[in-house]
Amino acid sequence: MTINSGGKGSVIILDTDGAVIKNLHLTNSGDHHNDLDSGVQVRGNFNVIKDNVIDDCLFGIDLQQSENNIVKRNHISSKDEELGMRGDAIRLWYSFENKIIGNTITNTRDMVVWYSKNNVIKDNTTVDGRYGLHFMYSQYNLVENNSYKNNSVGIFLMYSDGVKILNNTISHATGAAGVGIGFKETSDIVVADNKIIFSSIGLSIDVSPYQPDTTNYFTNNLVAFNGVGIRFLANWKDNVFKNNHFKGNISQIMVMGGKTANRNVWEGNYWDDYEGFDLDHDGIGDTPHDIYAYSDRIWQDVPGAQFFKGSAMLELIDFLERLAPFSEPDLILRDKSPILDVNLDTITIKENNHSELTPESGPEMLPGFKPENELERRLKGYLQ
């Protein structure tokens, strides 16, 4: 069944408890941002909205002061407007204990969670938007097993404490402001088992954690093939990085203002540019992995020098400084126990009829997308 709003207002306004909206095609809402013209506006509790197609609607599903609702397996797209003029796919405002599960979102603006806590956001796919997921002042939410591709920013948390980000894939957050996962004044978070790949910035950390006596934990994440693996916007502390895998990033770490990231804990991470050995074969490097600020990082503090990034001239200057430094370079970070034996459980080797060893292909990063280049084809194994 199709419900067409005729280009005015919201298609359905759900101001009740315990209703079910399913298997509908909701289309052609109004285009007024101030009225939040939506496919479904929810103003109640214990409702179920599932298996619907919502298209040509400014906003998709808008929940305000609504609790214990289920939003599941909906296909949502916005109006055919410029990115900033689209509406949000799913919007939670002062809404608690909701479950946002298994939705497919394309060509919208953001998914936003504002002033909302104890929500579950799981198994969703978001493509071609601005913010795949944007938190503000929202505590104790769970973000698990989602896929974000070709968005300006994958996930961004502002002033949102106690959030768990687990087993998500964030890729192709490109452009000047492209960030896989970003944190601003956010505390007590757990970021584990995520894949953050092919983005301008993998992780961006700004004054996080913010609350006193709190710690942010980053564990077993793959941060690979980004322009910058981790960017610190300040000389901050109390982040713990353990058993993460930094691979194929142009720069592993960037600290603005010429500061250091060594006030954080770095332990047992894999760095593909580690230059040490493992003579006792315990899987741990015999010497620490140190990252110093040499001339190859001048572009981070002098914007005009970015023109020469990767050039032979800058590489020569960097080589000479490493060979005979004029002064002691600044230590950016030290991982005292870098790991060498990477066990990502990613590539299964099998024998074919010709007794050749070949890797099994991994799954696609997102439905409907095929690898676009050789790097992506190589990375498929890591995404299994």
Model-predicted segments: where are they?
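Extracellular beta-strand-rich solenoid/capping regions of secreted or surface-exposed proteins
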Residues: T2-N23, T27-N47, F59-Q64
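Extracellular beta-strand solenoids
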Residues: I3-S5, I13-L14, L26, V42, ...
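Eukaryotic tandem repeat interaction scaffolds
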Residues: Y131-G229
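Detector for repetitive beta-architecture
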Residues: G18, N23, F46, D51, ...
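Solenoidal tandem-repeat scaffolds enriched in leucines and small polar residues
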Residues: I61-I165, I170-S171
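Structural detector of coil-to-beta-strand junctions
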Residues: G9-V11, H32, D37-Q41, G60, ...
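Functionally critical loop-and-helix segments that line ligand-binding/catalytic clefts
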Residues: T174-G180, I189, G202-Q211, Y217, ...
